A protein has these predicted regions:
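Cleavable N-terminal signal peptides
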Residues: 16-17, 27
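Central antiparallel beta-sheet cores of small beta-barrel/beta-sandwich binding domains
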Residues: 32-100
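Short, exposed beta-strand-loop hairpins at the edges of beta-sheets
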Residues: 102-123
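Short, solvent-exposed mixed-charge patches
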Residues: 129-130
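Sec/Tat signal peptide C-region and signal peptidase I cleavage site
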Residues: 23-29
Length: 130
């Protein structure tokens, strides 16, 4: 005959086993919101929520000649496409061209922003500063 103590221990053991089995399937979601630095130009871009989508705009530039770009929205509304990933239009503020953009979180302080035209893609890893 099983006592209450044994039944409780068995229940706790079963719950712990289920948790350990499910652990690898739990995705670690990183937050893209905040200010990020583009390493190649020193440009700072704020990623923010815009109606449940991911938007981004230029908030600071290193090169004074690019000061007119401050406030330019470069990502007007990307949608989540997978865990830690968003896809949407991406504006190149320098030439005005629109690309397919993919934001992939690589950790809490690193994201990769990739722009694609047809099958040609180029990406860069940005660092979170705020």
């Amino acid at each position: 005959m099983m006592t209450n103590r044994h039944s409780s221990l068995l229940t706790k053991s079963a719950a712990l086993t289920l948790f350990v089995i499910a652990l690898p399937g739990i995705a670690c979601a990183f937050d893209p919101y905040g200010t990020w630095m583009r390493p190649s130009t020193g440009t700072q871009v704020s990623f923010y929520d815009c109606g449940g989508k991911l938007c981004a705009k230029i908030v600071a530039v290193k090169d004074e000649r690019r000061k007119s770009k401050i406030g330019t929205v470069i990502m007007p509304g990307a949608t989540r496409s997978a865990d830690n990933q968003w896809k949407g239009d991406l504006l190149n503020a320098d030439d005005g061209k629109i690309y397919t953009g993919v934001v992939t979180m690589q950790g809490p302080n690193a994201l990769n922003l990739t722009g694609c035209v047809a099958f040609i893609c180029q990406g860069e890893t940005w660092t979170k500063i705020k």
